């Protein structure tokens, strides 16, 4: 009888899922796949806007050729497919719909999060 009551209790009162915190773009590094299809939004870790100006970007990105060298925030290696990526991000054209913005830099030492 006790196991029946416990089963009913667990069936109607499922465990709460942990609350997700805000997206932290400063912790993203490694291989990244940039998705452009809005229909795949639910499969993406977050949304990103590619900022044309360095001054307004949240994160400066340096493209690494090898995934092994992309070991710090701001160092990204482009993944050939979403299945091989550590992070999949949806690229949006509207800045207000993005979780954060990025700008590509050509200098490796400039890569990373901006500090205010």
Where are the language model's segments positioned?
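Repetitive, compositionally biased segments used for assembly/scaffolding
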Residues: 18-116
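Bacterial N-terminal signal peptides
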Residues: 3-12
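Hydrophobic membrane-targeting alpha-helices
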Residues: 13-17
């Amino acid at each position: 009888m006790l196991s029946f009551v416990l089963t009913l209790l667990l069936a109607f009162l499922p465990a709460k899922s942990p609350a997700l915190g805000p997206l932290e773009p400063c912790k993203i590094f490694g291989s990244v796949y940039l998705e452009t299809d809005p229909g795949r939004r639910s499969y993406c870790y977050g949304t990103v806007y590619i900022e044309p100006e360095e001054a307004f970007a949240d994160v400066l990105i340096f493209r690494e050729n090898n995934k092994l060298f992309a070991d710090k925030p701001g160092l990204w290696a482009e993944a050939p497919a979403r299945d091989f990526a550590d992070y999949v991000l949806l690229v949006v054209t509207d800045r207000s719909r993005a979780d954060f913005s990025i700008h590509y830099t050509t200098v490796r030492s400039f890569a990373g999060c901006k500090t205010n």
